Amino acid sequence: MLLRQPTTVTEAQECMAQGAVPVGGATLVWATWQRDGFPDLAMSLRGLPEATAVEPESLGAAVVLHRIDDRVPEVLRRAAGSVGTGAVRRTATVGGNLVGSSLRCLLPAALVLDARATVLGPDQPYETDLAEVVAKRHLLLGLRWRTPVASGYRKQPAEAGGPPPLVVATAVHVDGEGRHRLRVAVREGYDVLSETAGCDAGPDETLDALERTDLGALPAGARDVVREQVADILGPRAGR
């Protein structure tokens, strides 16, 4: 297998045109290749500046998870810190987790940040939503978002080898008219749900609104965790 490491977007597009298969931190991809055979040509984005940035409102797809620190919002930092072991976080990448892994541990955090994805198309990079990236498995260059007012993250304990643990991510944003909106994303099993509700009226009213969305159909235990997380993030705002 020949591995190329482009340092510009143009070089990366040339690699794509030649049929190069992206390789990064998704260990499941390596396992598949070991079983089925390695591709003739692969490419890594770790030499591409657009894919290696760690900034307050952007994160590159080739960033390994252990590099995600307090430069990014709390919800994303805590999501990255909860993935696997230290050894896993030193090799797993943002793009590998979101596109190459069935668990997609970072997806709830990215959804509540209302993150937009920059992907590498055949002609030029373009921006799209996370749903398209996950569904079509695009070559991800990075994520961008607006800094939230507050954010939170909770991952329930789980037994090794069992089903994926419940994840609840939250973030409060200010819309164009100055109103506060709460975004909540839940990973239940392999499914991820995301909903939004106004939150200026307080936790109780916000929870009532969320119960009328698809989140209201979650199992009772998952709804309890959602309620706790909503109370945690909105409680300090009560009375403001």
Describe each PLM feature range.
Residues 1-240:
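C-terminal structural segment of proteins
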